[in-house]
């Protein structure tokens, strides 16, 4: 039982070390970009991109990173299973939404006009 606990403890320590490396890489990217602001912009941008990619690579090696990759793969599989609407269905739905939006805007415009006249009648102010 204690051997299993020790194995879990070392696994957690390794996970923590990976996240610390990720944090250090991101901090180096930010601080390095600030300290070397006199260097050419493309070189700084390339260095930042490389450091962020390295941090992302290390993050993907963690347990949460592996779970994220698995989730992304499952999501991609689910997207493939979706029955997408045809072009005609999409066009009809879009036209219905546009028509309902136009009708609602006219109703709200009329209601606003009525309320403005009512308030101006009650308060005696003219707008």
Curated annotation (Swiss-Prot):
UniProt keyword annotation of Transport present: yes
PROSITE patterns: SECE_SEC61G
Membrane topology type: Multi-pass membrane protein
Gene3D superfamilies attached to this UniProt entry: Preprotein translocase secy subunit
GO molecular function per UniProt: protein transmembrane transporter activity
Record-annotated membrane-spanning stretches: 16-36, 41-61, 96-116
Protein's UniProt keywords contain Transcription: no
Any one annotated GO CC term: plasma membrane
Pfam families: SecE
GO annotation, biological process: intracellular protein transmembrane transport; protein secretion; protein targeting; protein transport by the Sec complex
Keywords tagged on the record: Cell inner membrane, Cell membrane, Membrane, Protein transport, Translocation, Transmembrane, Transmembrane helix, Transport
Subcellular location: Cell inner membrane
Main localization category: membrane
Family: Belongs to the SecE/SEC61-gamma family.
PANTHER family: PROTEIN TRANSLOCASE SUBUNIT SECE
NCBIfam families for the chain: PRK05740.1-2, PRK05740.1-5, secE_bact
Subunit: Component of the Sec protein translocase complex. Heterotrimer consisting of SecY, SecE and SecG subunits. The heterotrimers can form oligomers, although 1 heterotrimer is thought to be able to translocate proteins. Interacts with the ribosome. Interacts with SecDF, and other proteins may be involved. Interacts with SecA.
Role noted for this protein: Essential subunit of the Sec protein translocation channel SecYEG. Clamps together the 2 halves of SecY. May contact the channel plug during translocation.
Protein name: Protein translocase subunit SecE
